[in-house]
Amino acid sequence: MRRQGLQQLQRGSRACPDHGGGPVEEHDLLATSWTWAGREPVRERIRAVADAGFAGLALALDDLHEVRATTGFADLRRMLDDAGVVWVQLGTLGEWWSTANRADQDADRGVVLEAAATLAAWQVVVRADHSVPGAPPGRMAEAWDRLAMQAEGVGARLVLEPEPWSNLGTVERASRFVAAGHPNGGLLLDAMHALRGGSTFSSIAQGVVPATLAAVELSDGLLHTPNGMTLAEESRDGRYLPGSGAWDLPGFIRTARGLGYAEPWGVEVRTPALRARPLQDALRVAAAATRAVLDAADAHGAPPAPAMPTSAAPTSAVDFDRPRPPVVPDAVLRRRTGPATSA
């Protein structure tokens, strides 16, 4: 059984006593490569991801090359199994359509496909063309289909992450590209890239082919890109904790669900303040913030919580203070008892 299939069998719901004991959905979180990046050894970082409550993680190309040259992918799989990680995402591959720098591209593709086979990876992520002018998407179609077939051969799905500064700059356009290609292709819907690319909840709901939606990543952000910062720089250093920015993430989540998306929810957060924290603390904060936003999306349209009582609460024995006799000043006592006499 593949990793994600096992997790789907194990997933359930927990009771919520504050709302009459009704079920509250348990959500799988996936830490993207930036979210759990650090200088610690891979084994320690994987353990930190699992301890923070994540069920999945994304491995970057640098990590894959390092593991292949040192411990090997079989040992990495044991680390993931021991930590209980069940969703594994690999990438991100670039220039997969290009005939230039073939040696580097072939090396990256080879390490990703080898890792996907050994790790029973869920997905392989690729990006579009960042060059100016970008390659016409039609020229990329054949390479996309070929890579999608290669990913299928090792049991993973190929997913495209559209970025606003690429030749497939909107999720709607990227979805059309994916839908026209190999059925093993999919779309990664990233909150920052989608909203900064000009998409709205309505355009996503109407313009994304439901069958293409394969992954979702959550982060929060400011209302506008800060002055002096490019979109790419904001994407790298301005990804705030879910719920701490200006975006309607519960609405974004409901839009993705309306297209049929279920689990897991990628968490891609990266700011100077988060990077300054110990990795385990940063991961715990990121997981808690994301779960709060998902819970808010779950609660949309649900019956309101019971009203708080309006009558005064009775005084409990713990709060009860025993009456104390009044304190009488010494001068008053002397007047009452008269002057002291000596023997």
Task: Kindly label every feature range from the protein language model.
Residues R277-A299:
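C-terminal helical cap(s) of enzyme catalytic domains, especially alpha/beta-barrels
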Residues E26, A55, L59-E142, H193, ...:
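Structural motif corresponding to the early beta-alpha repeats
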Residues Q10, A15, R47, D81-D82, ...:
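Active-site acidic/histidine proton-transfer and metal-coordination neighborhood
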Residues G38-V49, A103-A115, G198-Q206, L249:
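Short, acidic/polar
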Residues V49, L57, L80, A116, ...:
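Conserved, mostly hydrophobic/aromatic
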Residues V24-E40:
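Boundary/entry segment of secreted carbohydrate-active catalytic domains
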Residues Q8-Q10, D28, L57, L90, ...:
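Acidic/histidine-rich catalytic cores of soluble enzymes
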Residues W36, G266-D281:
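A short, acidic, flexible beta-alpha connecting loop/helix-capping segment that sits on the rim
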